[in-house]
Regions:
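Short, hydrophobic beta-strand segments that form beta-sheet elements in well-ordered domains
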Residues: 33-41, 86-87, 92, 109-111, ...
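Short, polar loop motifs at secondary-structure junctions
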Residues: 38-46, 91-98, 204-206
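PAPS-dependent sulfotransferase catalytic domain
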Residues: 102-161, 165
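Catalytic core and acceptor-binding pocket of nucleotide-sugar-dependent glycosyltransferases
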Residues: 138-233, 242-243
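GT-A fold catalytic core of metal-dependent nucleotide-sugar glycosyltransferases
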Residues: 72-120
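Active-site regions of enzymes building and remodeling cell-envelope glycoconjugates
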Residues: 49-62, 103-111, 215-219
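N-terminal anchoring/stem segment of glycosyltransferases
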Residues: 1-67, 79-83, 227-231, 235, ...
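A conserved donor-nucleotide-binding helix/loop in the catalytic core
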Residues: 59-89, 181-193
Length: 249
């Protein structure tokens, strides 16, 4: 089984993207052939040990919104890749225990947001602009669940088809012009609302979402992480985590 893992790790997210790859391979106990598709403004080659299959594509962005909106177009560039499955994870996702692909593999998969049964239990954070392609009305008759923008995936064929529509919707909204409050996540939720995926319930989600290791607080994306990059480059064979803004082994 050829599984492609897609990461977008520009600017300060680079360090976290390297963390994800190393910890993924360290804790992975499955049988799949794993390829990482690493979209970044920094080549990861000198930061990773030999034996990890990581394919680098240069991308850059000026704002966080531009960065998060790179997801669909980046995945579309993988149309001719050899991976039979493609799964996107946010670069600031962390892994702390052994796992296999069984918890996330599927034909088209979405993750139940951890807030779905918390602050969003009564009212989901859907986009409510009726002019937007991400629009879901308050009085929708369909069952409601709020999904992560930080994780989604499936077969390559399904992912390419999905991302083609998501990218079309993004570009169509730019003509208004309009940017949904939760960006790509709003489009993902609109699609899954009408086309329910195989769901990973939040209680079964085996990774930690949005763990930035306290690298800065505001304006995180543009934090200077040169010292962290130098440290992990010099110890590229070591598994590490980021805690309180520092590298820990």
């Amino acid at each position: 089984m050829n599984i492609g893992i897609v990461l977008i790790a520009t600017k300060a997210y680079f360090v976290l993207g390297i963390r994800f790859i190393k910890r993924f391979m360290h804790f992975y106990k499955g049988t799949g052939d794993i390829t990482f598709y690493f979209f970044s403004d920094t080549d990861p080659t000198d930061y990773l040990p030999e034996g990890i299959n990581c394919k680098f594509t240069y991308v850059t962005n000026e704002t966080w919104v531009d960065g998060t909106n790179l997801k669909f177009v980046s995945i579309l560039s993988l149309n001719n890749c050899k991976s039979g499955y493609l799964f996107y994870f946010d670069a600031d996702t962390n892994i702390i225990k052994d796992f296999t692909e069984k918890w996330f593999i599927g034909n088209m998969v979405g993750g139940q947001h951890y807030g779905d049964q918390d602050w969003m239990k009564k009212k989901k954070d859907y986009d409510r602009n009726p002019l937007s392609k991400a629009y879901i009305p308050f009085d929708t008759p369909l069952p409601q669940m709020y999904y992560y923008g930080a994780f989604f995936g499936g077969t390559k064929k399904n992912m390419i088809k999905f991302c083609e529509l998501m990218r079309f919707n993004q570009l169509d909204d730019k003509k208004i012009p309009y940017e949904p409050v939760f960006n790509d996540e709003s489009y993902i939720n609109q699609y899954f609302h009408h086309h329910p995926p195989e769901v990973v319930p939040s209680k079964n989600f085996e990774f930690i979402i949005s763990d930035k290791g306290r690298i800065g607080t505001t304006g995180f994306m543009n934090q200077n992480t040169d010292s962290l990059k130098n440290e992990i480059k010099n110890l590229k064979n070591n598994i590490f985590d980021v805690q309180y803004g520092k590298i820990v082994y």
